[in-house]
């Protein structure tokens, strides 16, 4: 890979302190406990990085933090492209967009409740703090593994500006710039932008002259810092991300078990690689260990409707957000209000099967809005610091999965291999999953740090959270009607396009499929599923630390937290798959 070539063009007076990796870590100021402290003064396991350190390491997205943070891993699901964050082995494996993470993500003090919202470019960063272990007292739910705080550079009193341009492999062009300065006696502003584009993809098709993986993304942020009075200020933060990049394709590697999908028409020649003349050899579209070798489906035309779908793995995602942070210094007490709103819209296609054939692909459409409000009072002196606060959040998600499957998977292969008759007679080609999820959460919290001697300090924290999450949805018959054909053949229903096809398979339900078949009313076993999870949890933290000297802090912590429960928002066949998932406590 070519080394990234960077040139820094200075516009005006540039006053940006550079912190090298060799400098001692105590020079980094963090806000892990909602107030500024030296990283060596905090009784929390923290990896803190300055913006310059991150820039030197090619920091581009939030997921890149895993490359230089011990214990942090980030994997992207092939099914939906949702990032999965794990710290010290505490994570989750759920490709549903609606699933809650075990790692909290905060951007300039505002929580991002779903990891799919974190995939935009990172730029003009002041620092990033990775907190390890449950952070339930100050940050609340969904921080059982830890917390990551992303902090942007703030507007400056003096004018400064900068522009960085870079060229890299695959024709990648990376441009980042900012301008900052005074807007009068009582206001300061900052505008920053970054765009990354590449001229070619890094994945190469194993069956045709095609490539995948081009980047085309842009992000900007405008910040306005206004002094409302001598002791009151407001920081406005408007941000926008547009991502038109291509997703990666799965790689089918040498040794992959060839499934039934390849055995039947129209892929009958593949049988030669199982029991024919080429038995035991690797099909030509399977990689032999090359990381950039892959295959994918570019389009699919429905035989039933004649409609052609663009299935090339790619994104059309936008995030728009606005936050306002108000601080009122009342002398010994500081009142802080943080209000945040984010709107995330997504149309994204992914290929699951790793081959050129269309055995498993999907298009995700997401409409997600989030709102949060935090109010907190804080104060203290050299010996005692305290925080009291309340928090409220509300988010709503509408998700639409359109799944595509081939006749080789559910049709002809079934006939060739004597699978269940309905699949051979009525293959399923497309299906839709649609759902709505609404989540409301409220919390009260307190935090006290008491230095009872020159070296010893005791920290106590507690938070009570009440959450309600409602999920309503179903797997519906798509426009091609093939799912209805299967259900009507298998169960004697009278389904049509747009009808719910999720089976009530709960034996305790009065409308379960077996009871309805006996009663001669099978249609009654199919209806939209809806349920609500209500969670009330008390979380706490106790830390005792001992300061050996300015460079060494010994501490011990006992803390707990919880990850919100949820629902299987992805494709489901029966209502038992949609039963609520209980909260996870750690």
Task: Locate predicted features.
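Hydrophobic, lipid-facing positions within transmembrane beta-strands of outer-membrane proteins
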Residues: 26, 83, 146, 159, ...
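Transmembrane beta-strands of outer-membrane beta-barrel pores
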Residues: 165-169, 195-199, 240-244, 330, ...
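Structural signature of Gram-negative outer-membrane beta-barrels, strongest in the C-terminal barrel
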Residues: 225-229, 377-378, 389-393, 437-586
